[in-house]
UniProtKB/Swiss-Prot annotation:
It comes from Bacillus subtilis (strain 168). Keywords: RNA-binding, Transcription, Transcription regulation. GO terms for biological process: DNA-templated transcription termination; negative regulation of translational initiation; positive regulation of termination of DNA-templated transcription. The gene is mtrB. The keyword Ribonucleoprotein does not apply. It comes from the Bacteria. Belongs to the MtrB family. Oligomer of 11 identical subunits arranged in doughnut-like structure. Required for transcription attenuation control in the trp operon. This trans-acting factor binds to trinucleotide repeats (GAG or UAG) located in the trp leader transcript causing transcription termination. Binds the leader RNA only in presence of L-tryptophan. The lineage of its organism: Bacteria, Bacillati, Bacillota, Bacilli, Bacillales. This is Transcription attenuation protein MtrB.
Length: 75
């Protein structure tokens, strides 16, 4: 596994119930491959891997990366 993939991760903390965290695949076709639903206060640490190229957050959450911190908004 490429070392870069194993070190890139994000911390996502739900600010409201029902936050969806969706993993998307690498390759010629980007596809959904994993989903988690978080309730208020729950935290997930998501990692970019050889299979995961993007992470989508739907709902209000605090997102922390090596590049900084941001907050997603309600739809």
């Amino acid at each position: 596994m490429n070392q870069k993939h194993s070190s890139d991760f994000v911390v996502i903390k739900a600010v409201e119930d029902g936050v969806n965290v969706i993993g998307l695949t690498r390759g010629t076709d980007t596809k959904f491959h994993h989903s988690e639903k978080l309730d208020k206060g729950e935290v997930i640490i998501a990692q970019f891997t050889e299979h995961t190229s993007a992470i989508k957050v739907r709902g209000e959450a605090l997102i922390q990366t090596a590049y900084g911190e941001m907050k997603s908004e309600k739809k």
